[in-house]
Swiss-Prot record:
<dbReference type="InterPro" id="IPR039411">
    <property type="entry name" value="NSA2_fam"/>
</dbReference>
<comment type="similarity">
    <text>Belongs to the eukaryotic ribosomal protein eS8 family. Ribosome biogenesis protein NSA2 subfamily.</text>
</comment>
<feature type="region of interest" description="Disordered">
    <location>
        <begin position="1"/>
        <end position="73"/>
    </location>
</feature>
<dbReference type="GO" id="GO:0005730">
    <property type="term" value="C:nucleolus"/>
</dbReference>
<dbReference type="GO" id="GO:0000466">
    <property type="term" value="P:maturation of 5.8S rRNA from tricistronic rRNA transcript (SSU-rRNA, 5.8S rRNA, LSU-rRNA)"/>
</dbReference>
<dbReference type="GO" id="GO:0030687">
    <property type="term" value="C:preribosome, large subunit precursor"/>
</dbReference>
<keyword id="KW-0539">Nucleus</keyword>
<dbReference type="GO" id="GO:0000463">
    <property type="term" value="P:maturation of LSU-rRNA from tricistronic rRNA transcript (SSU-rRNA, 5.8S rRNA, LSU-rRNA)"/>
</dbReference>
<feature type="compositionally biased region" description="Basic and acidic residues">
    <location>
        <begin position="60"/>
        <end position="73"/>
    </location>
</feature>
<feature type="short sequence motif" description="Nuclear localization signal">
    <location>
        <begin position="5"/>
        <end position="12"/>
    </location>
</feature>
<keyword id="KW-0698">rRNA processing</keyword>
<dbReference type="InterPro" id="IPR022309">
    <property type="entry name" value="Ribosomal_Se8/biogenesis_NSA2"/>
</dbReference>
<feature type="compositionally biased region" description="Basic residues">
    <location>
        <begin position="37"/>
        <end position="59"/>
    </location>
</feature>
<keyword id="KW-0690">Ribosome biogenesis</keyword>
<protein>
    <recommendedName>
        <fullName>Ribosome biogenesis protein NSA2</fullName>
    </recommendedName>
</protein>
<feature type="compositionally biased region" description="Basic and acidic residues">
    <location>
        <begin position="11"/>
        <end position="30"/>
    </location>
</feature>
<keyword id="KW-0687">Ribonucleoprotein</keyword>
Length: 254
């Protein structure tokens, strides 16, 4: 075949046919994925899930490639104030990370919260039943109707294993946090959901409803402890209904 190709060349429409065949591959793979079932389907979806996770990691690595990294050697000894020393160096960053993790373990109940009581939310209001299967006869999946928070490195489970679906349009990453003493509002990144008063399940899903205790990043506010350390995160309680307003309003717990 190689010899014949060298002597006579290719068909005139070879490149066009090859382009069309490549373009059809995605559609063919999609059709095959919808037809297969049983053990073969599980293997196929597991393989595709692994490919997508790897692709996501590769894209993230490409995005971070052009980000300028801070040079630790550029800052001379004594050039920074004492309360900013925790932000420099791998050793100090690790200590700060450990402090944040320890703080997350603290009970949210020790604060006197602005909203001590909230109304209960029925399961029918919280979840929408999703019919699945070829004849739409299975109803074990649920879609969350409320605003949610998922972490930055969140990856969805394979379709056959994902019970709770959290829509992209209802995922929140920032909250409007009001300082009760300063009477000032800041837009701060959310670090996690500490406690949802409705149910532990909603806490694990990261559902954001009225009265939920959030953990927000307050490093930009320049708050310092009595020991001179920068405060990295603090708790805040949601005071509105995010699914109705499209934003999160909360009060900082100081």
């Amino acid at each position: 075949m190689e010899e014949h190709r060298k002597r006579h060349g290719r068909r005139l429409d070879y490149e066009e046919k090859k382009r069309k065949r490549t373009a059809r591959e995605a559609h063919k793979a999609s059709a095959d994925a919808q037809k297969i079932f049983g053990h073969k389907a599980k293997l196929h979806h597991a393989r595709r899930h692994a490919e997508k996770v790897q692709m996501k990691k590769t894209l993230k690595a490409h995005d971070e490639r052009n980000v300028k990294q801070k040079d630790d050697g550029a800052v001379k000894e004594g050039a920074l104030p004492a309360y900013l020393l925790d932000r420099d160096g791998q050793k100090d960053a690790k200590a700060l990370s450990s402090a944040v993790k320890d703080r997350r373990k603290d009970r949210a109940a020790k604060y006197s919260v602005p909203l001590p009581k909230v109304r209960g939310i029925a399961e029918e209001e919280m979840f929408k039943v999703i019919k699945t299967g070829k004849s739409k006869s299975k109803s074990w999946k649920r879609m969350v109707n409320k605003a949610t928070f998922v972490g930055e490195g969140f990856t969805r489970k394979p379709v056959k294993l994902e019970r709770f679906i959290r829509p992209m349009g209802l995922r929140m990453t920032k909250a409007n946090v009001t300082h009760p003493e300063l009477k000032t509002t800041f837009q701060l990144p959310i670090l996690g959901v500490k406690k949802n008063p409705q149910s532990p399940l909603y806490t694990s899903l990261g559902v954001l409803t009225k009265g939920t205790i959030l953990e927000v990043n307050v490093s930009e506010l320049g708050m310092v402890t009595t020991g001179g350390k920068v405060v990295w995160s603090k708790y805040a309680q949601i005071t509105n209904n995010p699914e109705n307003d499209g934003c999160i309003n909360s009060v900082l717990l100081v």
